């Protein structure tokens, strides 16, 4: 009897497990999101999120997300989900960000919190597990943050991951694996990867310089030395400047009035500069002394750097100078393939249409500005012509007045 491949894998216990979807939010049910997301009351002036697909989009309904709506504000909003631990499994955090306002300074990242977070008191100092996503502030800061809280300390990545800084929607993905490796993707393409231990300073270094080692006193690091047999020539020392032999005292020089005459100085053609003995290879050269290293007694490997006991809340805790950013398509799962597929089915489906709509708006705006410029120039030309006509009319009236005055003068003469 022949068995199908899926059945055979199932019998062998090798069938792929269904992905665990811990959190997914696409805002497809109108204002119902307000029942799932909690505004922090830690400050009274936190900015407000609104549901919007923005000024341009690929699909007006599918592209709706949480949009920051007030300039120069802190924002603090979060959603809770069933707590889970990522011990022994992959963690994938994914979402889309759209800075349609051409952001100059502001965050576009998310934070994952443990279950003990008081959502109504969430603020910038609330302890989190992971912070991930883009952050832009001026030309100097355009990075993707990947920050882990390790034993109560927030540890930043040692690499610089550049984020997207245009006005379109982009997909950000963080993958943390149980072998203590990670991967960062933008628009479903890898932009960084590596080892958690290598790319963050979670642990003390494996090796340290031997505190008992010291460079031997006779260790010579000079590759070249002065030739002891070389000596300075007897005629070497000449002054750098000498009196000009061609200079003559002016005939009208009065020493009582002008003081003693001194000829100007010139560069001495025989001047050779500072003498230095020639260099030879140092026969005692031993190379650069390298401080020997030993195993660091304070280093202890940690196979669970990646692991957290509790993930339970996803939060948007950020500052924006210019509002307008849209967050959408949140996903927390343990399945890398599912996350990639979800990204392709959301961001991937609407990205082209979004760009087309933006390009069309830009072209319409360009034509509108051209038409306004043309109209303004025509109005300016019309005003200039009207002013010129007025000047011509004034000149004609002045000429007529002068002619009338001349005629009157001539007539008066004739009468006389």
UniProtKB/Swiss-Prot annotation:
Q: Where is this region: N-domain?
A: 18-197
Q: Where is this region: C-domain?
A: 309-416
Q: Which domain of life is it from?
A: Eukaryota
Localization, UniProt: Endoplasmic reticulum lumen; Cytoplasm, Cytosol; Secreted, Extracellular space, Extracellular matrix; Cell surface
State any single GO MF term: ubiquitin protein ligase binding
Task: Return the annotated region ranges for Disordered.
Answer: 193-277, 350-416
Annotated residues for binding of Ca(2+): 26, 62, 64, 328
**4 X approximate repeats, as annotated region:** 191-255
Start and end residues of each stretch annotated as 3 X approximate repeats: 259-297
Q: In which tissues is it expressed?
A: Predentin and odontoblast.
- Any idea which UniProt keywords this protein has? Acetylation, Calcium, Chaperone, Cytoplasm, Cytoplasmic vesicle, Disulfide bond, Endoplasmic reticulum, Extracellular matrix, Hydroxylation, Lectin, Lysosome, Metal-binding, Repeat, Sarcoplasmic reticulum, Secreted, Signal, Zinc
| Residues with the N6-acetyllysine modification | 48, 159, 209
* N6-(2-hydroxyisobutyryl)lysine: residues bearing it: 64
Q: Where is this motif: Prevents secretion from ER?
A: 413-416
Question: Which portions of the chain have biased composition (kind: Basic and acidic residues)?
Answer: 207-251, 352-379
What is the first-listed, main subcellular location in coarse terms?
endoplasmic reticulum
Q: Name one GO biological process term.
A: peptide antigen assembly with MHC class I protein complex
Q: Where is the signal peptide?
A: 1-17
Q: Where is this region: Interaction with PPIB?
A: 237-270
Subunit composition and interactions: Monomer. Component of an EIF2 complex at least composed of CELF1/CUGBP1, CALR, CALR3, EIF2S1, EIF2S2, HSP90B1 and HSPA5. Interacts with GABARAP, NR3C1 and TRIM21. Interacts with PPIB and SPACA9. Interacts (via P-domain) with PDIA5. Interacts with PDIA3/ERp57. Interacts with CLCC1.
Q: Which family does it belong to?
A: Belongs to the calreticulin family.
Q: What does this protein do?
A: Calcium-binding chaperone that promotes folding, oligomeric assembly and quality control in the endoplasmic reticulum (ER) via the calreticulin/calnexin cycle. This lectin interacts transiently with almost all of the monoglucosylated glycoproteins that are synthesized in the ER. Interacts with the DNA-binding domain of NR3C1 and mediates its nuclear export. Involved in maternal gene expression regulation. May participate in oocyte maturation via the regulation of calcium homeostasis.
Q: What is this protein called?
A: Calreticulin
Q: Which organism is it from?
A: Rattus norvegicus (Rat)
**Gene encoding this polypeptide?**
Calr
